[in-house]
C-alpha cells in the first residue's frame, strides 16, 4: 500500500509551480471576474445576473420576483461564488446613485446614499429594468456566442448583444491582479451621438468626439472642474478629474447658510455630514452654527448654518478642501479586448462597440435570412400542393402510412422532406381560396425580405444605417438630461480663498522691516483718544512706507535696480502692533545693494490703469498695469535701465494725470502723462526731462488739484509752492526753476506733491530724524530758496525725505484711516551724492 501511494507522488519545482499557479489565478481574476468586456461593458457576474433574469422571464413587463430566486439561479447555474457577492452586485445595479441607468428594477429596501445596507434578499424583489432589456435584445437570434458554464451542464453567453454602449454609459470599476479599471458613467444621448459620429467618420479624432461626449455624467450629479483631466483621460485612457458638490449660499433671517444639493459620485452622505461635524468639534473649521440633513424623496438638501460674522464663501472653500464635498475621480479606461486587458482611449472604446454591433446586426440578419429562406421554402411546397390540390389529396388518401404519403409527395412533385411534411401537416382550412391568397402574399413578402436581407449582408453601409437607426430610436426612448455640470475653470478656488478678506495696514520701515496689522487695530479707540503705539522701531529707524489695502490685494515692490516683486497682502506676516516687523529680504529675493523705492497696492490688474516710471537720469516710461499681472517669485525687470541709471519712482495712474519731476539742480517740469506713449514692460523709456552736467532726478509725483509742491534741500531748507505756479510743458524739456540753489541751502534732495494733512519725515546722513507737519511749512514762491526745516551741522546733510499719511506713534480712528486718501503712502528714497 505504501509503495502504491509512493508511486502517485510527483515531484515538482515549487518556484515554477508558484509562478504557474499565480499566473493562472491572476488571469482568471482578470478575465473571469474583475474586468468588463469592452463590447457590453459587463463583468461576468453582471452578465450572468441579467441572463438569469431573462431566462426566468423576469422582464420589465412582468411582476417582481424575490431576489433570492435570482441569486439562487445565478450561483446554481452560472456563478459558483458566494450568494452575498451576487446579491450585492444586483443591489448596486438597482441603485439610482450607483448606476447612471439602473439595469435592475428593485422593489423594497435596496440601500441608500447614506450607506444603509439593503434588506436581505428574502425580503426584496426585482425584475429587469426597461433599459436592461436592450442589453439582451436579439439574444435569441444567434447574435452572440455561448460557452459552457462552470460544470458543463448549461450554456451561458460570452457577451451580450448590448444594443447601447453600456461600458461608457454605466461605467465600471474593478480591481484585478496588478491592474484596476475605473470607468466613469456617461449620458446616454451623448455617447450615442459619439457612436453615430464615429460611424459616419471613422477618421474622427478624440477632440472631435468630445464635441459630442463632453465628459462623464454621474448619477449623483455634482460638478466637474475643468476639462484638462477629461481630455487627458479620453486621449490616453488614463486621467483624473475633480468633482465638486453642487451648492448654493442663501440668505435666511439676516444670516447666510450653505445648501448642498448634490454630492460627488460614490460619496457617503452620512459620513460626509459626520466629517463636517467632526471638523467643527475639533475647531478645524470655524463659523458653522448648525448642521442638518433635510433630504427627502424630492431630493438632497444638507443645510449648513453660517455664523453671522463668518464669510460663507471662505467657509465653503474650506469645506471643499477638508471634506468629500470635493473629491478626485481617477479614470482608467481598462477593459477586455478579445480576452486581453487593454487601456483604451475614447475612440477605441467606441470603435470596439461599433464593431461588436456590426457583428450583432450581421448575425441577426443572417439568422433572419435563414429563417425567411426556410419559411419561403415551405411556402413554395404549399404553393405546389395548392396548384395540384386534387392530385395531392388523391395521393395522400391512397397512401397506407404517413411515410408512404411523404415519400410519394417528394417523388411526384420533387419536394424536400420539410416541404412534404408541411403539406401533410397543413389543415384543411388552408385549402380555401382566401388562405391560398394569404400564402401567396406571405411568399411575396418573404421573397422581398430575403432580397433585403441579402442586400444588407452585401453592403457594410446598410449595416451601419441599421445601427444608426436603432441607436436613434434608443436615444429617443431613454435619453434624459445631463446631471453633472462641467465648469470651464480647472479649479475654482486656491489657497487664498481659504483666507478671509480683511482690510489691513502694511508698514515698511526705512531699514527694511515689514509687517501687517488688521485695520481694526487702529479703530479700537474712541474719538479723541491718545492713540496707541503702532510699532516698535530703533531710534534711527522710522516707518517709510505705510498704506491700507486688503489682505487679498497684490502688493508691488519696485526697487532702485528696476525690478518689481509681488506679494499678496496675506503673505506679509501679521504681527502685534508694537512688533518691529521682519526683514523684507526674508520675503523678497532682493540683492544686497537693492532697496525698495516704491510700493503700490493693486486690487485688480485692469487694462485701463497704468504705471508711470521715472529714472534717476530723467527717463520716463508708461506701461499698462496688466503687463505686471504675472510676476515670478524671484521678481522681474519692470524697466530696462541704461548703464549707471536707477529707477527713482513709480506711480499708478488712470491715464489722464499730470506728472511733475524735480532735479537736484532745482529744475522742475510738469507735463501730461500721455506725452509718454505706452510701452512694453521691457522697454527703456523716453526722455522725461533734459538734464545738464551731473544733474539727476530727486523727485517725481502725480499732480493733484489743490495740493502743493514741496521741496527739501541738502542743507535742510524747504518750502511749499502752489501747484498752479508750475505751468504745463512738453516732456523732454529742461523745465523751469523750482528753487534758487545757493551755497546756503544746497541742491535739492526731494520733491513731492503734498497736502496740509501730510507729515514729513526728514533724516540726515548721520541718522538724525525730524518729523514736521506740512501745514507748518511756509508757502513761498517758486524761485525762492526756502526756509530752514532742520538744522544740520557742518559737514552734515539731508539724506532722505518721506511723506507720511498716518502718524505712526499716535494712530487713532480720527487721525488715521480717514486720512489715507487713495491708499497712497509711497515714499521715494533720495540719495546724497
UniProtKB/Swiss-Prot annotation:
Active site residues per record: 123
Compositionally biased spans, kind Acidic residues: 806-821
Pfam families registered for this protein in UniProt: DNA_gyraseA_C, DNA_topoisoIV
Keyword check for Coiled coil: no
Gene Ontology biological process: DNA topological change; DNA-templated DNA replication
Subunit-level organization: Heterotetramer, composed of two GyrA and two GyrB chains. In the heterotetramer, GyrA contains the active site tyrosine that forms a transient covalent intermediate with DNA, while GyrB binds cofactors and catalyzes ATP hydrolysis.
Family: Belongs to the type II topoisomerase GyrA/ParC subunit family.
Summary of the function given for this chain in its UniProt record: A type II topoisomerase that negatively supercoils closed circular double-stranded (ds) DNA in an ATP-dependent manner to modulate DNA topology and maintain chromosomes in an underwound state. Negative supercoiling favors strand separation, and DNA replication, transcription, recombination and repair, all of which involve strand separation. Also able to catalyze the interconversion of other topological isomers of dsDNA rings, including catenanes and knotted rings. Type II topoisomerases break and join 2 DNA strands simultaneously in an ATP-dependent manner.
Protein name, per record: DNA gyrase subunit A
Lineage: Bacteria, Bacillati, Bacillota, Bacilli, Bacillales
Amino acid at each position: 500500500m505504501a509503495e502504491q501511494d509512493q508511486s502517485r507522488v510527483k515531484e515538482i519545482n515549487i518556484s515554477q509551480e508558484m509562478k504557474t499557479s499565480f499566473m493562472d489565478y491572476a488571469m482568471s481574476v482578470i478575465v473571469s471576474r474583475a474586468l468588463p468586456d469592452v463590447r457590453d461593458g459587463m463583468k461576468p457576474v453582471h452578465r450572468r445576473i441579467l441572463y438569469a433574469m431573462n431566462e426566468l422571464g423576469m422582464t420589465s413587463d412582468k411582476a417582481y420576483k424575490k431576489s433570492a430566486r435570482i441569486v439562487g439561479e445565478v450561483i446554481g447555474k452560472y456563478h459558483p461564488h458566494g450568494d452575498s457577492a451576487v446579491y450585492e452586485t444586483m443591489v448596486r445595479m438597482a441603485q439610482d446613485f450607483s448606476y447612471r441607468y439602473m439595469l435592475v428594477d428593485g422593489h423594497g429596501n435596496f440601500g441608500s446614499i447614506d450607506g444603509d445596507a439593503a434588506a436581505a434578499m428574502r425580503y426584496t424583489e426585482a425584475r429587469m429594468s426597461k433599459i436592461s432589456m436592450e442589453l439582451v435584445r436579439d439574444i435569441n437570434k444567434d447574435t452572440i456566442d455561448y460557452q459552457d458554464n462552470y460544470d458543463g451542464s448549461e450554456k451561458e453567453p460570452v457577451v451580450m448583444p448590448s444594443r447601447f454602449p453600456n461600458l461608457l454609459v454605466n461605467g465600471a470599476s474593478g480591481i484585478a491582479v496588478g491592474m484596476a479599471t475605473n470607468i466613469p458613467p456617461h449620458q446616454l444621448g451623448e455617447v450615442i451621438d459619439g457612436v453615430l459620429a464615429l460611424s459616419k467618420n471613422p477618421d474622427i479624432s478624440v477632440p472631435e468626439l468630445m464635441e459630442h461626449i463632453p465628459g462623464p455624467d454621474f448619477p449623483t450629479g455634482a460638478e466637474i472642474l475643468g476639462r484638462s483631466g477629461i481630455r487627458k483621460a479620453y486621449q490616453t485612457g488614463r486621467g483624473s478629474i475633480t468633482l465638486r458638490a453642487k451648492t448654493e449660499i442663501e440668505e435666511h433671517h439676516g444670516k447666510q447658510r450653505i445648501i448642498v444639493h448634490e454630492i460627488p459620485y460614490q460619496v457617503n452622505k452620512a459620513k460626509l455630514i459626520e466629517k463636517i461635524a467632526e471638523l467643527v468639534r475639533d475647531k478645524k473649521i470655524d463659523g458653522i452654527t448648525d448642521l442638518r440633513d433635510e433630504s427627502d424623496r424630492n431630493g438632497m438638501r444638507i443645510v449648513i448654518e453660517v455664523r453671522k460674522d463668518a464669510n460663507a464663501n471662505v467657509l465653503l472653500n474650506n469645506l471643499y478642501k477638508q471634506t468629500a464635498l470635493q473629491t478626485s475621480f481617477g479614470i482608467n479606461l481598462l477593459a477586455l479586448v478579445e480576452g486581453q486587458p487593454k487601456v483604451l482611449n475614447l475612440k477605441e472604446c467606441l470603435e470596439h462597440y461599433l464593431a461588436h454591433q456590426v457583428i450583432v446586426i450581421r448575425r441577426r440578419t443572417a439568422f433572419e435570412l435563414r429563417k425567411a429562406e426556410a419559411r419561403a421554402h415551405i411556402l413554395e411546397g404549399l404553393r405546389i400542393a395548392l396548384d395540384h390540390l386534387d392530385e395531392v389529396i388523391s395521393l395522400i388518401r391512397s397512401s397506407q402510412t404517413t411515410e408512404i404519403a411523404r415519400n410519394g409527395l417528394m417523388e411526384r412533385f420533387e419536394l424536400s422532406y420539410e416541404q412534404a411534411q408541411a403539406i401533410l401537416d397543413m389543415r384543411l382550412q388552408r385549402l380555401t381560396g382566401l388562405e391560398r391568397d394569404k400564402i401567396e402574399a406571405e411568399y411575396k413578402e418573404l421573397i422581398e425580405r430575403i432580397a433585403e436581407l441579402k442586400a444588407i449582408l452585401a453592403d457594410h453601409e446598410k449595416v451601419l444605417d441599421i445601427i444608426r437607426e436603432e441607436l436613434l430610436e434608443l436615444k429617443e426612448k431613454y435619453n434624459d438630461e445631463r446631471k453633472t455640470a462641467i465648469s470651464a475653470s480647472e479649479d475654482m478656488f486656491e489657497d487664498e480663498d481659504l483666507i478671509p478678506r480683511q482690510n489691513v495696514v502694511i508698514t515698511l520701515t526705512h531699514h527694511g522691516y515689514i509687517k501687517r496689522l488688521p485695520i481694526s487695530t487702529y479703530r479700537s479707540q474712541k474719538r479723541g483718544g491718545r492713540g496707541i503705539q503702532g510699532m516698535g522701531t530703533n531710534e534711527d529707524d522710522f516707518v517709510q512706507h505705510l498704506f491700507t489695502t486688503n489682505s487679498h490685494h497684490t502688493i508691488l515692490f519696485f526697487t532702485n535696480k528696476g525690478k518689481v516683486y509681488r506679494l499678496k497682502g496675506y503673505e506679509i506676516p501679521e504681527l502685534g502692533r508694537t512688533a518691529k516687523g521682519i526683514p523684507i529680504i526674508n520675503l523678497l529675493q532682493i540683492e544686497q545693494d537693492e532697496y525698495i523705492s516704491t510700493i503700490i497696492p493693486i486690487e485688480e490688474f485692469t487694462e485701463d490703469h497704468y504705471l508711470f516710471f521715472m529714472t534717476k537720469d530723467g527717463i520716463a516710461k508708461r506701461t499698462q498695469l496688466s503687463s505686471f499681472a504675472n510676476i515670478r517669485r524671484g521678481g522681474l525687470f519692470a524697466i530696462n535701465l541704461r548703464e549707471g541709471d536707477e529707477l527713482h519712482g513709480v506711480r499708478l495712474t488712470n491715464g489722464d494725470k499730470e506728472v511733475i519731476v524735480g532735479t537736484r539742480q532745482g529744475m522742475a517740469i510738469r507735463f501730461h502723462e500721455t506725452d509718454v506713449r505706452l510701452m512694453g514692460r521691457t522697454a527703456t523709456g523716453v526722455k522725461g526731462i533734459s538734464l545738464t552736467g551731473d544733474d539727476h532726478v530727486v523727485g517725481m509725483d502725480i499732480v493733484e488739484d489743490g495740493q502743493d509742491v514741496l521741496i527739501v534741500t541738502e542743507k535742510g531748507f524747504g518750502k511749499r509752492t502752489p501747484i498752479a505756479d508750475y505751468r504745463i510743458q512738453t516732456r523732454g524739456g529742461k523745465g523751469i526753476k523750482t528753487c534758487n540753489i545757493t551755497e546756503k541751502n544746497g541742491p535739492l534732495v526731494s520733491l513731492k506733491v503734498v497736502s496740509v494733512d501730510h507729515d514729513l519725515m526728514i533724516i540726515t546722513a548721520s541718522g538724525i530724524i525730524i518729523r514736521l507737519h506740512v501745514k507748518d511749512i511756509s508757502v513761498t514762491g517758486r524761485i525762492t530758496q526756502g526756509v530752514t526745516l532742520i538744522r544740520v551741522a557742518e559737514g552734515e546733510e539731508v539724506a532722505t525725505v518721506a511723506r507720511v499719511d498716518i502718524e505712526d506713534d499716535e494712530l487713532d480712528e480720527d487721525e488715521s484711516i480717514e486720512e489715507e486718501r487713495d491708499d497712497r503712502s509711497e515714499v521715494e528714497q533720495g540719495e546724497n551724492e
